[in-house]
């Protein structure tokens, strides 16, 4: 039986029809929003999602390197290296990237949320944010297991450094916060420094920005 979520993503994506001087032109809803410089990061962070996100970031930079990009995040997290590919691209490109959590930003999702441009990191009131240390498993020879364990420790240290950079918290505070699954409300994430504001509606004087 086909996964209902997979069915939704593949068959029920709305289309938008616009009138142009050359007649009608149709877009799927996500492509239309991409024209407005809006990127969606939804679902698990893995190589396929990461590749699409990086490609969209690079495309929007090429389109206009001075205009901000809005990234909407609703993700349970996923593969660390896939998330770091998105993170590095966000830091690499010229446009400022605004982030907004809708639903949840857990694990790597929370890191991408806090990686947005300073003063441009937001969450909706009922969003949930979760931070924790990386996890992994490996089978094989003892030496290989030890090497993989060391790599996980290296990744843990690097992720902690990223959280320190973007939250302004000390390394000790970050290590304590990430020791176990740490679930936060939007307000708690604001107090911790993961985001800059909790918003419940668009500013009345600017409806053009996505966040």
UniProtKB/Swiss-Prot annotation:
CDD domains, per database record: S14_ClpP_2 (cd07017)
Reactions this protein catalyses: Hydrolysis of proteins to small peptides in the presence of ATP and magnesium. alpha-casein is the usual test substrate. In the absence of ATP, only oligopeptides shorter than five residues are hydrolyzed (such as succinyl-Leu-Tyr-|-NHMec, and Leu-Tyr-Leu-|-Tyr-Trp, in which cleavage of the -Tyr-|-Leu- and -Tyr-|-Trp bonds also occurs)
Any single GO CC term annotated in Swiss-Prot or TrEMBL for this entry: endopeptidase Clp complex
Gene3D superfamilies, per database record: 2-enoyl-CoA Hydratase, Chain A, domain 1
GO molecular function terms listed in the Swiss-Prot or TrEMBL record: ATP-dependent peptidase activity; ATPase binding; serine-type endopeptidase activity
Record InterPro entries: ClpP, ClpP/crotonase-like_dom_sf, ClpP/TepA, ClpP_His_AS, ClpP_Ser_AS
Coiled coil location: none
Location of the protein in the cell: Cytoplasm
Primary location class: cytoplasm
EC identifiers of the protein: 3.4.21.92
Keywords (A to Z) from UniProt: Cytoplasm, Hydrolase, Protease, Serine protease
UniProt-listed GO biological process terms: protein quality control for misfolded or incompletely synthesized proteins
Top-level division of the source organism's lineage: Bacteria
Keyword Protease annotated: yes
Positions annotated as active site in the UniProt record: 107, 132
Annotated function: Cleaves peptides in various proteins in a process that requires ATP hydrolysis. Has a chymotrypsin-like activity. Plays a major role in the degradation of misfolded proteins.
UniProt subunit comment: Fourteen ClpP subunits assemble into 2 heptameric rings which stack back to back to give a disk-like structure with a central cavity, resembling the structure of eukaryotic proteasomes.
Family: Belongs to the peptidase S14 family.
Name of the molecule in the record: ATP-dependent Clp protease proteolytic subunit
């Amino acid at each position: 039986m086909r996964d209902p979520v997979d069915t939704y993503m593949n068959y029920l994506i709305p289309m938008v029809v616009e009138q142009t001087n050359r007649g009608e032109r149709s877009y799927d809803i996500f492509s239309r929003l991409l024209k407005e410089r809006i990127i969606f990061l939804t679902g698990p962070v893995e190589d396929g999602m990461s590749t699409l996100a990086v490609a969209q970031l690079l495309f929007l930079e090429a389109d206009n390197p001075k205009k901000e990009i809005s990234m909407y995040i609703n993700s349970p997290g996923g593969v660390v290296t896939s998330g770091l590919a998105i993170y590095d691209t966000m830091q690499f490109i010229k446009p400022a990237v605004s982030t907004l959590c809708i639903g949840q930003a857990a694990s790597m999702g929370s890191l991408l949320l806090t990686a947005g441009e300073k003063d441009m990191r937001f969450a909706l009131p009922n969003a949930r944010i979760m931070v924790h240390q990386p996890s992994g498993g490996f089978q094989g020879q003892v030496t290989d297991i030890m090497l993989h364990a060391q790599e996980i420790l290296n990744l843990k240290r690097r992720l902690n450094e990223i959280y320190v950079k973007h939250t302004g918290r000390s390394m000790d505070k970050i290590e304590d916060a990430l020791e176990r699954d740490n679930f936060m409300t939007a307000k708690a994430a604001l107090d911790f420094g993961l985001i800059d504001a909790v918003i419940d509606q668009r500013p009345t004087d600017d409806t053009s920005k996505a966040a």
